[in-house]
Amino acid sequence: MALLDFFLSRKKNTANIAKERLQIIVAERRRGDAEPHYLPQLRKDILEVICKYVQIDPEMVSVQLEQRDGDISILELNVTLPETEESKS
């Protein structure tokens, strides 16, 4: 019976490992598909508008799109503005 238990338990572990791997693959694909094709152009356009008013480094602008509950999309924009001459004194 120990031999039979060995083979049966091994199949169970293999199935669990395969299931976990598939869950990881599905999660990675969902995360990769979450970014729409227009996001890089949107970031560029936002950067151009900000540069009309404030001179900043392009790396100081971060645009991220987050999906929640399937129906909700959150666009997060972070801009680090340089210090002004008035605030330095």
From Swiss-Prot:
It holds the Pfam family MinE. It comes from the Bacteria. Transmembrane segments: none annotated. Keywords: Cell cycle, Cell division. Belongs to the MinE family. NCBIfam families: minE, PRK00296.1. This is Cell division topological specificity factor.
